């Protein structure tokens, strides 16, 4: 019995961070679909959504003299530290990542960088290139944060092309994209286990 328990894969906590605060966000829809895929078909992987809407805009005047942070920021930093890996839903604004996401990245990097040495994956949905340019800019930011992104597979969803990919509430309705999300998650799981083993 003990051998069976020790050989089982540990349950990895995937912190899902959506860069859009919009209720019916397509990027939020990708993350919700990821949570469902994990529950249905990926043992050992659990997606937990992180809400970044309560974070104040980065202002170092809000930090205390002893290096403390506002309560919402402290709670967020605790969540980042406790995660095994991250799945980011990154919309694209002006060829870059959205302000709420950059704000979250910056707060958790203040003082002791909470992102360091954590594995991550990015998915995105939008017009044009499906958010692809935001992903590449995000990867540049990740270099300084010491985030370790999986390289493949990539997922850029062209949200406005037919047939519809999302319903009016922002939920993913496309089976092919759902399968591609599964492949991203499997890659993230394998990469995370490899990094933790090292």
Residue ranges and their predicted role:
Residues 2-10, 148-198:
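Glycine-rich phosphate/pyrophosphate-binding loop and the adjoining helix
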Residues 5-43:
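N-terminal beta1-alpha1 ligand-phosphate binding loop
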Residues 14, 27, 31, 73, ...:
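A general structural signal for well-ordered alpha-helical segments in protein cores
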Residues 19, 52, 125-127:
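Cofactor-binding loop segments of dinucleotide-utilizing enzymes, especially the Rossmann-like FAD-
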Residues 40-48, 148:
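A generic structural motif
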Residues 49-69, 163-165:
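N-terminal beta-loop-helix "entrance" segment that forms/cooperates
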Residues 66-146:
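Helix-loop-strand module that forms the ligand-binding subsite of alpha/beta enzymes
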């Amino acid at each position: 019995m003990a051998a069976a328990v020790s050989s089982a894969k540990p349950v990895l906590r995937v912190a899902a961070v959506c860069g859009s605060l919009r209720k019916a966000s397509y990027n939020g829809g990708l993350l919700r679909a990821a949570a469902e895929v994990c529950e249905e078909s990926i043992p050992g992987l659990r997606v937990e959504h992180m809400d970044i809407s309560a974070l104040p805009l980065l202002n170092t005047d809000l930090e205390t003299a002893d290096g403390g942070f506002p309560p919402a920021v402290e709670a967020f930093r605790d969540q980042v530290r406790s995660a095994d890996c991250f799945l980011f839903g990154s919309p694209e604004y002006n060829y870059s990542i959205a302000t709420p996401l950059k704000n979250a990245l910056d707060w958790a990097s203040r003082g002791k960088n909470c992102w360091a040495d954590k594995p991550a994956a990015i998915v995105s949905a939008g017009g044009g290139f499906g958010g692809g340019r935001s992903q590449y800019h995000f990867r540049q930011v990740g270099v300084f944060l010491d985030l370790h992104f999986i390289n493949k597979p990539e997922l850029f969803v062209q949200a406005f092309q037919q047939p519809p990919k999302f319903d009016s509430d922002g939920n993913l309705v496309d089976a092919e994209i759902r399968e591609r999300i599964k492949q991203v998650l499997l890659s993230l799981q394998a990469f995370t286990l490899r990094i933790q083993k090292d």
